[in-house]
Amino acid sequence: MFSRAQVRRALQRVPGKQRFGIYRFLPFFFVLGGAMEWIMIKVRVGQETFYDVYRRKASERQYQRRLEDTSETNLHKLIK
């Protein structure tokens, strides 16, 4: 692994310390976030992407909520 001194030395080599301070690392994280988003959209694992799974799960949750709401409504009608 890396020692603390090696990490510190690598971080000191990033330009813009006086002008931007700690914010000089933002472009790296911006690019990293964009790459991660691209992977989640484009890369398929099996037949699905991350967003396919997300949409399916959201749809399933919405369906379950509707079932619960209708069963509660029917229960209230039976009680009255």
Curated annotation (Swiss-Prot):
The keyword Transmembrane applies. Keywords: Membrane, Mitochondrion, Mitochondrion inner membrane, Transmembrane, Transmembrane helix. One of its GO terms (molecular function) is mitochondrial ribosome binding. It is a single-pass membrane protein. GO terms for biological process: mitochondrial cytochrome c oxidase assembly; mitochondrial respiratory chain complex III assembly. It is found in: Mitochondrion inner membrane. Residues 1-19 are mitochondrial matrix. Pfam families: UPF0640. The chain crosses the membrane at residues 20-41. The keyword Membrane applies. Residues 42-80 are mitochondrial intermembrane. GO terms for cellular component: mitochondrial inner membrane; mitochondrion. Required for the assembly and stability of the mitochondrial ubiquinol-cytochrome c reductase complex (complex III (CIII) or cytochrome b-c1 complex), a multisubunit transmembrane complex that is part of the mitochondrial electron transport chain (ETC) which drives oxidative phosphorylation. Mediates early complex III biogenesis. Participates in regulating the levels of electron transport chain proteins, and therefore energy supply, in response to changes in energy demand. Also required for cytochrome c oxidase complex (complex IV) assembly. Associates with the mitochondrial ribosome. Interacts with UQCC6. Interacts with MT-CYB; interacts with newly synthesizes MT-CYB. Forms a complex, named COMB/coordinator of mitochondrial CYTB biogenesis, composed of UQCC1, UQCC2, UQCC4, UQCC5 and UQCC6; stabilizes nascent cytochrome b/MT-CYB and promotes its membrane insertion. Belongs to the UQCC5 family. PANTHER family: SMALL INTEGRAL MEMBRANE PROTEIN 4, UBIQUINOL-CYTOCHROME-C REDUCTASE COMPLEX ASSEMBLY FACTOR 5. This is Ubiquinol-cytochrome c reductase complex assembly factor 5. The gene is Uqcc5.
